[in-house]
């Protein structure tokens, strides 16, 4: 039987329990100017409301909304260990906006979720500044978010991140893979590094190698290469779709599952892919990871982007003008394979 005790005469506050409302308010005021730089004319409200407002009227004739949500995996753990908080927000935005871009959609607005045990205003500001910058660079409004201070839920100095994006595309321009045909060409666009995938394996290899942060990888410190922000493909790809929409039958964002499992997601079930592994040279960081981790080729292909962050599935007679357009925007690219009709169950062949 539970015995009731006399209540303490010492008054308690929410701050005593570990939640500092004043710190949260200070954070909001600090990030307001950063967030406003990402706003678009369609944004109808500022920060602080119960719901964020976005006016879609007049922009599309027959809009289809495309939504996506993601995190940054255990790259976040590495960022916290290194005390590098200002670019992980760019990763968060990129993982979401690059996904919705695949269907030809323009990212409209973004919301973030930041959770921690004890709110550190400087750390949170650095993280959200990266989110705001990523949104600004994608033409996507950071329209709202949630900062959750939850005592006892996270160890000191740790936090978690999630993002949510809404995009729109004219129904007639929606890319769903249905136009893909045998003989279509795969154009691979360069990544900035591992982006935000495979970091549980990367961290294991890095730690097993003795955490060689300063190791020179072709003129760049290893840790700088590993922490390079995920490339934001939105603006150049939207521009490409505007000028060459008939040339592109499908697109793929190379994330978890690597080249093996992502491109095939946008290919009709009766077709497959032949990827030429010699069509491009994997960046040195992937060569180091494979060597140091003694990774099989198959493990590389299904874990990492291996230097290809985004793929266009294009009609063959438009490859040259697409390549020129990509060159004009400074995007390194290669013809990495073709769509074919498979015999048997193997739909993806890399060799």
From Swiss-Prot:
InterPro entries registered for this protein in UniProt: PurM-like_C_dom, PurM-like_C_sf, PurM-like_N, PurM-like_N_sf, PurM_cligase
Enzyme Commission code: 6.3.3.1
SUPFAM superfamilies named among the record's database cross-references: PurM C-terminal domain-like (SSF56042), PurM N-terminal domain-like (SSF55326)
UniProt cross-references to Pfam families, sorted A to Z: AIRS, AIRS_C
GO biological process, one term: adenine biosynthetic process
Keywords: ATP-binding, Cytoplasm, Ligase, Nucleotide-binding, Purine biosynthesis
The keyword Transmembrane helix is annotated on this UniProt entry: no
Pathway assigned in UniProt: Purine metabolism; IMP biosynthesis via de novo pathway; 5-amino-1-(5-phospho-D-ribosyl)imidazole from N(2)-formyl-N(1)-(5-phospho-D-ribosyl)glycinamide: step 2/2
GO molecular function: ATP binding; phosphoribosylamine-glycine ligase activity; phosphoribosylformylglycinamidine cyclo-ligase activity
Domain of life assignment: Bacteria
Gene Ontology CC: cytosol
Location of this chain's protein in the cell: Cytoplasm
Catalytic activity: 2-formamido-N(1)-(5-O-phospho-beta-D-ribosyl)acetamidine + ATP = 5-amino-1-(5-phospho-beta-D-ribosyl)imidazole + ADP + phosphate + H(+)
Family: Belongs to the AIR synthase family.
Protein name, UniProt field: Phosphoribosylformylglycinamidine cyclo-ligase
Organism: Xylella fastidiosa (strain 9a5c)
Taxonomic placement: Bacteria, Pseudomonadati, Pseudomonadota, Gammaproteobacteria, Lysobacterales
């Amino acid at each position: 039987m539970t015995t009731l005790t006399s209540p303490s005469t010492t008054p308690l506050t929410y701050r005593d329990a570990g939640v500092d409302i004043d710190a949260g308010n200070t954070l909001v005021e600090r990030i307001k100017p950063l967030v406003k730089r990402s706003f678009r004319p369609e944004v109808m409200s500022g920060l602080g409301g119960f719901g964020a407002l976005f006016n879609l009227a007049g922009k599309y004739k027959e809009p289809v909304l495309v939504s996506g949500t993601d995190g940054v995996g255990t790259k976040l753990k590495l960022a916290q260990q290194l005390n590098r908080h200002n670019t992980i927000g760019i990763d968060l935005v990129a993982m979401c906006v690059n996904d919705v871009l695949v269907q030809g959609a323009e990212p409209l607005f973004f919301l973030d979720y930041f959770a921690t045990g004890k709110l550190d205003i400087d750390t949170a500001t650095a993280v959200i500044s990266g989110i705001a910058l990523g949104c600004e660079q994608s033409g996507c409004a950071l329209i709202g978010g949630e900062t959750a201070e939850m005592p006892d839920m996270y160890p000191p100095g740790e936090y978690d991140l999630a993002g949510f994006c809404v995009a729109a595309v004219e129904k007639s321009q929606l890319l769903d893979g249905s136009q893909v045909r045998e003989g279509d060409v795969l154009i691979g666009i360069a990544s900035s590094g591992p982006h935000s995938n495979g970091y549980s394996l990367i961290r294991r290899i890095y730690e097993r190698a003795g955490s060689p942060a300063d190791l020179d990888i072709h003129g760049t410190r290893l840790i700088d290469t590993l922490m390079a922000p995920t490339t934001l493909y939105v603006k150049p790809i939207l521009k490409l779709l505007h000028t060459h929409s008939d040339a592109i039958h499908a697109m793929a964002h190379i994330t978890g599952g690597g080249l093996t499992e992502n491109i095939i997601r946008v290919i009709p079930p009766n077709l497959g892919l032949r990827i030429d592994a010699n069509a491009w040279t994997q960046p040195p960081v992937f060569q180091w990871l494979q060597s140091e981790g003694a990774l099989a080729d198959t493990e590389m292909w299904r874990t990492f982007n291996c230097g290809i962050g985004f793929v266009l599935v294009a009609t063959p007679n438009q490859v040259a003008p697409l390549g020129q357009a990509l060159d004009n925007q400074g995007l390194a690219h290669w013809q990495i394979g073709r769509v074919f009709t498979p015999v048997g169950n193997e739909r993806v062949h890399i060799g």
